[in-house]
Amino acid sequence: MNVRRSAAAIAAAVTVIGFAAPAAVADPSPAPSASPSLPAGLYGTGDPQYDGVWRQSLALLAQHTVGVRPAAKAVDWLAGQQCADGSFAPFRAEPVKACDAKAMVDTNGTAAAVQALAALGGHDAVTGKAVSWLKSVQNKDGGWPYTPGGPSDANSTSVVIGALAAVGEKPESVVKGGKSPYDALVGFALPCSADGGGAFAYQPDKKGGLEANPDATAAAVVAALGQGLAAEGRSGKGSGGGGCADAGKPDPAQAAANGAAYLAQAVAKDGHLTSVLPGATDQPDYGNTADTVVALAAQGGAAQAQKPLKWLEQHAEAWADQGGPAAYAQLVFAAHAAGADPRDFGGIDLVDRLNATGPAPQATPVGKAAEDAKDTKESTKNDSSSGIWWAVGVFLVAGIGIGFLLISRRNKQPGQQP
């Protein structure tokens, strides 16, 4: 959620338009004060050129998830970023000017904005236009690319499925070329016999081969279950800890179970995923670990989600402080899905930290409302006990003389954009 992505997403976008924006770029500081060049309603203090809409969407959705009513100017800023055709670019410094052909619109930011605005309510016109645009750029395989005209990828397809579900659409009914989004999604799933069996690939390589990608897997598991960035955890034992089960081409439910099994195994030893970057020392992958918690909890593997959740509670504070609103949002989503208290996440209050990165909310649960919210979380945690696109490393990507920092979510890129 997180939103968010991998270098593969950037490479795919470069193929189509020369260069592309990551779903999320790390904020150097979570300080709330905006510089003269940043809109007052925007969350985060980092350059929003590549992730403004993504981080704003995740921040607002995370606030809504924990009962916080965001500042009106923050919501208005997000809605005001929409282009006339319904799409969203990562950031428009002058939204009064119409989007032109040079606007770097993308499916990930658009889908994330839909999820946030649909949850907040009162923006049917905006979300309706955005969904219409998303349908117009759907590929014939049923999936979506990061930028229109590119090949479908698991992360983009997943975040759009979440957007469709958020507005009450049935993703399986959104068909292009006789294919639904789920047809595309299961096409990225590796067979159990393969290395990394059960996982999802970001997209096929040039020879059609699939390589396991934890970022894509976490996103795809949630999407295959018909959920979005702020997925709900499922109580009960679930099937997140079982092995991969082949039955020919899996249906979405089986693909989700297989993907969750892969993720559960990936975090079983250390409690976290690892970011493997060319030329860099392997480091914990905080963002994709947060997304993994969401995926395991949504699939029903609450027991498997507890180890990575506890690891995040113990180790993710510095990462979130540096990552800013999108990172805090990913942790809120993880806590929400796994039944933890986001106001006591390893001793820190994620909600207060998130709120501090932008304009003061209109309302925050206090007193009995806050206690009720906490009791609900504890109940979910007890029920399930029986059973964030950011990589720590940064990439320097050159395209048309432009370099920018990537953070991986899943993934995804791929906030892509949680």
Q: Can you describe what each PLM-predicted range is?
A:
Residues 2-418:
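Preference for long, amphipathic alpha-helical scaffolds in soluble/luminal domains
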